[in-house]
């Protein structure tokens, strides 16, 4: 039996709970018990026979009780494995009729949570939506706030994945209302739940690139101190914060957030840690840091991870201003790097940075240099070279002018030198003034 199947609802543990429950006033029904365990023994080798056998448990029990509830859970699981989804839904709806009186509140909550977690592995979005909506409908009269919150959160995540933001906002409003005081303020006693809501809302604004709302919500989430959040939730919040800061050009803040997100994902065992490590590397390059991000104790074990290796090599080429190697790595590992839309969004900026560094080094010995020659050295079109030169001249990285008729860049080294001497002269005058002030005080 696979781990996933074992985890489905901790069958053995629950069997024990049922047999020896102190709350139960009835003696165990031996026929029911035998029928249940005989059915369970069939499910691996003959699942269809097991379904028929579990049906007999329901018939033997007559009135709704714990053994019928357990039999229905097994039938849901078997039908899921057989991809018999309509029958699975029918059995799930039948099981939900047991939660009001046939089994205890805690037991039903634990079981439904486990079922929802297991079904969440499905890629069939419509099936998941039906599951969550059916659960919420059944919970209207059950008054189980915890299960209602968890189910709504799962439905919200589904809408987020499907980019159905209108439906997601409706869910978020309901979730927020459940965590408010009578005055309509956030109930800080529900800090952990609030952080879950913020994480979901922050992901929505990140997907929509709504930085204004994202920034306010992100700051709000970091000020909740009453919660002991799950590291996965904090990983989501810090990752979205990193994306927000990077889009605003605040590379150092982005670097800090991505590093915190990576550590939280790593702690929770989430596969998002490798994605976030890629973002950390991206921020490291954009902030033009000479420090290798893989020198940190937390990141070092992932340096040679196949998922990360391309980014590791990219850092090396970037720090060495090796544009040929940089572009070669991008081409060779195109899917690994460029399939991520967030990385793709910022690769052009990295290319511009590395081309600028190579350009500065290339033109340094010259007073005049042909633009087609620069084009050849940088391996980009003449039009792209001109665009890069214009940007460098405007931000004073290069002192010069473009002669478009003759396709020349004319450099003014004297202007650059003059600016340096002006700064030195100003500094000397300030030192003289300081010296005179000290002498006057000592006199």
Swiss-Prot record:
PROSITE patterns: PCI. It is found in: Cytoplasm; Nucleus. InterPro entries: 26S_Proteasome/COP9_Components, PCI_dom, TPR-like_helical_dom_sf, WH_DNA-bd_sf. Keywords: Cytoplasm, Nucleus, Signalosome. It comes from the Eukaryota. The keyword Signal does not apply. Belongs to the CSN2 family. Essential component of the COP9 signalosome complex (CSN), a complex involved in various cellular and developmental processes. The CSN complex is an essential regulator of the ubiquitin (Ubl) conjugation pathway by mediating the deneddylation of the cullin subunits of E3 ligase complexes, leading to modify the Ubl ligase activity. This is COP9 signalosome complex subunit 2. The gene is cops2.
